[in-house]
Amino acid sequence: MNEQFRVAQKLGLMFRPETPLPEDIKSWAISQLNAKSPALGIKSFKSMNSDIKEWPRELQPNLKKRAEMWTVYRANRKKEREKIDGQETEAAKRANEHKNLMGQKDSLKFSHRNVYGQDQLKIRFMSFWANHFTTGNIHDNQNVIGHLIDEAILANLNSSFSEMLYKATSHPSMLTYLDNIWSSGEDSVETREQRRNGRQAGLNDNLGRELLELHSVSPSAKYTETDIRNAANVLAGWGTDLERPLNEMREVANTTDHWDLYKRTWAQPGVKRVMGKTINQGKGGLRELTDFLAMHEHTISYLSSKLAQHFVSDNPSQSDISYIKNAWKKGSGNLDQIHTAVIERAILSKEPKFQWPMTWLFQTIRLSNATFYMG
C-alpha cells in the first residue's frame, strides 16, 4: 500500500476514483481540516459520479422546522388512533412518516456524506465526536439527532472543544435523550409547586452524570455523587418538549429557540460546586461548567488517549498521547490544533489501525465506486 492510501485508510475514507492523489500527503491531510463540508449525495440509485450534488435545502431543515414536523407527526398519530381524517389508512401512515420524520433522511444524508464527500478527514473527525456525544434514536429525539451532528459537531470542528461541549450538552437532542427536559431543581419554584399539587417533580441526574463520566473528565477524576448532583442542578431548567407551543416557550423562557431554552422557574437557586469549582446560579452557569470541564487535566488526558487510540494506534504510546495533550494545552482546546497533532502522530506511526465496521464499509464503497445507498 502506498503512502497516500495508507494515510487515507488510517485517517480518512479512501480516495474516490475521480480524485487525484495528493503529492504531499501530510499537507493534504492537515488542509482537510478546513475543507468545505457540504452534504453531498446522489439523487438516484442509477446516478453517476457527475450527478453528485449537495443535498436539497428542504431535506436539511432547521431546528424550528424539525420541531414543527414532529408536532404534526404526533397530531396525525393521534388522529390515526381516533380514526379521524383518514389517518388510519396505510397510505396516510406512510405519508405522515415520510413527510414529518427526519430519522431515515438524516441517516441517509450521513451515509452519503461519507461516501461522496470531498472532506474525508473532516468527516472522520465528525464521526468520532458524534460517537463521543452519542444520543439515542428514540421517540421525539429521532427528528433532531441529525441536527446535533451537523450543527453542534460538524459546525464546531474548527472551534474549541469548550464550544463543542457546550453546544452538544445544550442541544435539544442531548437534553431530550437524557430526560433533562423534565429535570427541575429540588428547591425550584416548579418542584415546590408540583409537589404541593401531589405530582412528581425533581432532579434528574442522567445528563449531569454523562457529562462528567463520558463527555469530559471520566471516572479517573474521582468525582463524587455530590459532584454529579451539583452538575445536574446546573443543568436543571435546560430544554423543553419539542411539541411545546411557541407561546408557552415565550412565557416560560422568553424565547422560541429550542437550543437556547432555559426555564428559570425550574432552575435550582444558589451557587453550586462541581469538583471544587464554584458555578454561579442562572443560565450562564452551564457555560461556566462546560468551560471548566473542557480544560480540566483529566478531560485532556482522557480525550487525548481516546483520540490516539482511534486514529493513531490500537495501543498508542505515551509519547503519542502526550503529543496530543501538549497541543490541547498549547491551543487552549483549539480543535484544529488538537486534530493536527492527531494527524501528525497517525502519519508518523506505521502500525496498522483497526477501523469501525462503518468506516471500513464507507472506504470500500468509495474505493470501488460502488452504488450502495439509494438516492
Which residues does each PLM region occupy?
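His/Asp/Glu-rich metal/cofactor-coordinating catalytic motifs and the adjacent surface-exposed loops
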Residues: 1-90, 94, 106, 147, ...
